[in-house]
Amino acid sequence: MFKSLTIKSNKVKPREENDENKQDPDPSNQPQQSTRQGENKSENKSLQTKMTPVTFEESHAKMQDKISEKNSLRDLTTNPNHQHPTESKGAMSEQKEMETGKEGLVSPKSKPLGVPVINEYADAQLHNLVRRMRQRTMLYKKKLAEGDISSPEASPQTAKPTAVPSTQESNAKLKEEHYYHILCFKFQKMPLTEYLKRFRLPGSIDSYTDRLYLLWLLLVTIAYNWNCWLIPLRLVFPYQTPDNTHYWFITDITCDIIYLCDMLLIQPRLQFIKGGDIMVDSNELKRHYRSSTKFQLDVASVMPFDVFYLFFGFNPVFRMNRILKYTSFFEFNHHLESIMDKAYIYRVIRTTGYLLYTLHINACIYYWASDYEGIGSTKWVYNGEGNKYLRCYYWAVRTLITIGGLPEPQTSFEIVFQLLNFFSGVFVFSSLIGQMQDVIGAATANQNNFRISMDHTISYMNTYSIPKNVQNRVRTWYEYTWDSQRMLDESDLLCTLPVTMQLALTVDVNLSIISKVELFKGCDTQMIYDMLLRLKSTVYLPGDFVCKKGEIGKEMYIIKQGEVQVLGGSDGAQVLVTLKAGAVFGEISLLAGRGGNRRTANVIAHGFANLLTLDKKTLQEILVHYPDSEKLLMKKASVLLKKKAPATETTPPRKGLAFLFPPKQETPKIFKALLGGTGKAGLTRLLKLKREQTIQKTSENSEEGGGKRREYEDKEREPSEKILDSSECRANCIIAEEMPQSIRRAALPRGTTRQSLIISMAPSAEAGEEVLTIEVKEKAKQ
C-alpha cells in the first residue's frame, strides 16, 4: 500500500518527465512517440500562453479530472494485461493526445502534491470502468469517421416501391413522344393503344338503355334482311351468274362475320334479370345465353353448310339457314319503338314491309312454277317477256289482293297452285289489313277520345240552349288544350304509372317552378315532392278571370305557360303588373286565417294561360305529416301578411310649439263603457257612489253605537242629503239626456245612497258596444 502511495506521488512531476518514463516495448515506435511528445510540448506551450485566468473552483475541478486521467494511465502502464484486446495503437496515441491537450489547460504550478486513496479496490474498478468507456468511445468515433457504423437494432424492411410513379412517368413520356410539329404549331397524336381502349367491349351490356347496342342490332338486321330478301331471289331467278359470283360471295361472308360477332361477342354480354336482380357477372351471362333458345337459333343460323359448294356448286339453297336469326330482327323492332316519339309511324312502315315481303315470296314462287311448267308454255305462266321480277311481282299483287283479270289456269298443277295462292292471299292480306287498322287506331286513339268528349259537351250545351258566345269559348278551350298538350287531363296519363315514376316526371317538369315560391323555401324536400304530385293543370282562355277581388281564396296558382294581369285602381281596370311564366300568386290564401284569405285584386288571363293549382285542403292534408314545415310556413305567412298589410295613417306634422306637449292619449274602452258616454260628469258620479258605498260599510260595522249618535248623525246628514239629492237630480237629468235609449234604463234612481250597489257589464245588441248595469241590493229587514 505504501508503494502505491509513493507511485501516486510521482504523478506530481511534470508531463515531460512522466512521458519519458513511458516507453513502448517495441523500439520501432520510439521515434513516433518522441515526435508526438515534441508536438504535445509545443501545444502545451501555446495553450499556456493563450490561457485565460480562471477561478479557484474551475482550476480545482480540472485538476481532479487530470488526476483521474493520470491514475487510469498509470494502470495501463503498470498492468498491461488489463488492456482491451481490440484496442489499437492508433487509439492509444489519440488517447495520449487528448490527455496532453487537457494538461495544457492547467499550469504546473497549480497541480496538487497528492491525493490519498481510501479504497484501492474501488479505485481500481472505477479506473477500469473509465478506461473501457473511453476505449469504446474511441472505437465508435473511429467507425463514425470511416462511415461503417450501423445501428445495433434491426432496421425495418423497406417497402417495395410502388409502380404508380413509374407508370405516370411512362404515360408522360408516351404523351411527349406522340407530339408532332407542323410549321409553328404543335399537335398531339393519340397512340394506337388509346384508340383501341375506346373500342374495348364492356363486361356487361344493358340492352334497354345502351344506344350502341341498338346500332349493332341495326347492323345485324341489315344482314338478316339481305339474306331474307336475296336468298330466295338468287335461288329462283337467274340473277346469279358465274361472272358476278365473287360479289355475292364477298357479301355473304360479310353477313356471316356479323352473325358470328353477334353470337360470340355481343349476346354473351347482355344483362338479364333473375329474381328481381340485374345480373352482370360474365360467367353468369354466358351461362344464361347458352341455355336459351336464342343461342340454339343463332348456332343453327351460322352452320357452315356452305362447304357443300365444293360438291354441288355455288347454290344459294345452302344458305337458307341464315333466315333462322329472326330473334335479333324482332328485338331491334322492339327497342326502336320504345325510343321513338311517334312509334306508330314505324309500325305502319314495318307492316307495309311485311306485305311487300309476302308479295316478294309469292313472286318468287310464281316464277318457280312458271319455270317448272315451262316459260311461255301456257297463258297462265310467265311468258318470258320484259323484266322477270317486275312481271312476276305484278302477278303476285293482283293474285293476293284478289283483283282478278288474270288468265285462267289450264293444267291441274296450275289450278292447285292458284287455289292455294288465293287462300293464302286472303288470309295474309286480311291479317295485314287488320294489323294496319290496329296500328292506325292506336295512333289516333287519344284524338278520338278528344273528339268524343267534345261532341258530348256540344250536345249538352245545345240541349240546355247555352248562349253561342259561351259555346264558342268552350270549343276554343277544347281546341287549345288538345293542340298544346295532346290530352285533356294530364292526371289520366300519370295515374297508370307507379308513384315513383309519377314523382320522377313531376320533378323534372315542375320542380324548377315550385322552388321559386318564397313561401316554400326551407321546407322539407319530401313535402315539396308530395305537393308536386298534387298539382293540377288548368287552362284559362284570354280574358278569363283567374280570381276576383273579395272572393274567398282557396287555391295557389303557378304560371306554367302564358301571362296573367293584375288589375286595380279606382275603376278596377288598371293593369298593375303582368305576371309571366314561373310567377306565383295567391300563396298567402293557403295559410291565412279567417278574414285574411280574401282576394285583394282581380287577376285575368292576358292570353291562353296554363296554370298549376294547389288548393288549401290538399295542402292541409300534406302538412299533417310535416309539423316542422307547418310551423315554418305559418311564420312565413305571418311575415308576408305584415308586409302586404296596408300602412297605418300617419299623424300630420305639428306646427309651432305644439311639439312641446305630448299628444293626448285615447281613453280606454273599458272606461268609456263604465262612463256610459257622459264624460267627466259620469266619472264624478261614479266616484261619489264609491264613496257612499264605503260610508255604508262603516256604518253597518258600527251598529253597536248608541241611538243618540245615530240621531245626531241623521240630523247632520239631512241638509247634506238635500244638497246631494238636488245635485243628483240635476246629474241624472243630464245623463238621461246624453245617454242613448239603450243605456238610459241603467240610470240609478234617487235615494239609493245607503244601499249596496252591484255594477256589471253586458254586451249590447249593437256591434262593438257594451251596457253598464247597476243594481241596488235591498237591505235585509232586521
Curated annotation (Swiss-Prot):
Function: Pore-forming subunit of the cone cyclic nucleotide-gated channel. Mediates cone photoresponses at bright light converting transient changes in intracellular cGMP levels into electrical signals. In the dark, cGMP levels are high and keep the channel open enabling a steady inward current carried by Na(+) and Ca(2+) ions that leads to membrane depolarization and neurotransmitter release from synaptic terminals.
Region (Disordered), start-end ranges: 1-111, 147-168, 692-724
Description of how the protein assembles with itself and partners: Forms heterotetrameric channels composed of CNGA3 and CNGB3 subunits with 3:1 stoichiometry.
Keyword Nucleotidyltransferase: no
GO terms (BP aspect): monoatomic cation transmembrane transport; visual perception
Site, as annotated: Central gate: 429, 433
One Pfam family it belongs to: Ion_trans
UniProt remark on domains: The cyclic nucleotide-binding domain (CNBD) comprises three helices and a beta-roll of eight beta-strands from CNGA3 and CNGB3 subunits. Upon cNMP binding transmits the conformational changes to the C-linker domain of the S6 helix to open the ion conduction pathway.
Protein name per the record: Cyclic nucleotide-gated channel beta-3
PANTHER family given in the database record: CYCLIC NUCLEOTIDE-GATED CATION CHANNEL BETA-3 (PTHR45638:SF8), CYCLIC NUCLEOTIDE-GATED CATION CHANNEL SUBUNIT A (PTHR45638)
Catalytic reaction(s) noted: Ca(2+)(in) = Ca(2+)(out); Na(+)(in) = Na(+)(out); K(+)(in) = K(+)(out); NH4(+)(in) = NH4(+)(out)
Membrane topology note: Multi-pass membrane protein
GO-annotated molecular function: cGMP binding; intracellularly cAMP-activated cation channel activity; intracellularly cGMP-activated cation channel activity; protein-containing complex binding
Segments for region (Selectivity filter): 402-405
Disease involvement: Defects in CNGB3 are a cause of cone degeneration (cd). Cd is characterized by day-blindness and absence of retinal cone function. This autosomal recessive disorder occurs naturally in the Alaskan Malamute and German Shorthaired Pointer breeds.
Organism: Canis lupus familiaris (Dog)
One cellular-component annotation, GO: intracellular cyclic nucleotide activated cation channel complex
Localisation: Cell membrane
Family statement drawn from the similarity comment of this UniProt entry: Belongs to the cyclic nucleotide-gated cation channel (TC 1.A.1.5) family. CNGB3 subfamily.
Compositional bias annotation for Polar residues: 74-83, 152-168
Extracellular topological segments: 238-244, 313-315, 367-388
Alphabetized UniProt keyword annotations: Cell membrane, cGMP, cGMP-binding, Disease variant, Ion channel, Ion transport, Ligand-gated ion channel, Membrane, Nucleotide-binding, Sensory transduction, Transmembrane, Transmembrane helix, Transport, Vision
Positions of transmembrane segments: 214-237, 245-265, 295-312, 316-330, 344-366, 389-415, 416-440
Annotated region (Cyclic nucleotide-binding domain), positions in chain: 525-641
